[in-house]
Amino acid sequence: MPPHKARLVSGLFYCPKLTQRMIEMSDLKFSIRRAEPNDAAGCCELIRNEDVFAELVQLPYPTETALRETLSSKSNEGDILLVAVDNGEVIGQISLFGNTRMRRRHAAMFGLAVIGHAQSKGVGSALMKAMIDYADNWTTFLRIELTVNADNDKAIALYKKFGFQQEGLLRNYSLRNGRFEDALTMARFNPNQAIVK
């Protein structure tokens, strides 16, 4: 099949020439596409959401200007930020960033955020499918890594569903609401790549 043809991957159609894909869930219809500079305000609103922010390792009050600059600048090859959009509202985002160090270029880190009212409705799963399809089939990343708060059971279950395995426990990893919290490190290997031992 020519590379420009759409193909079914994990229940979602992916075509490199398409800029977005529509997803319909029982009570939600949204699109997933690459983030653009004009999405900066929506991404900031998502990150500021109380249900989202507590699980992120970021400082409060992200600025739209800083995010717009990030989205406007040339990123490293392979880096991507996808957004889930419902009626103009950014309801979720997933980012994948490769490591720039020579001996770690086979690894990428990712982060996921879904707004409270869209959680447990398939948005996180749809974003994960899109990101994994991109990482496995269009990049040379061998492993995808993440760090998650140790008490974020919903996120951990989602990551395990997509093949991530726990690799370690980081004690007192991050400050959340004035307390130091533990985190887990998890990783997933690209099944299409040969693993050199």
Label for each model-derived stretch:
Residues 30, 37-38, 56-117, 128-129, ...:
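Acetyl-CoA-dependent GNAT
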Residues 16-38, 184, 190-197:
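Conserved N-terminal entry element of GNAT/NAT acetyltransferase domains
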Residues 1-20:
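Positively charged N-terminal leader segments that act as targeting/secretion signals
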Residues 136-147:
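Conserved GNAT acetyl-CoA-binding A-motif
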Residues 45-59:
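Helix-loop element at the rim of GNAT/NAT acetyltransferase active sites that forms part
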Residues 146-156, 173-177:
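Conserved beta-strand-loop-alpha-helix junction that forms the acyl-donor binding cleft
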Residues 121, 125, 150-168:
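Conserved active-site alpha-helix within GNAT-family acetyltransferase domains
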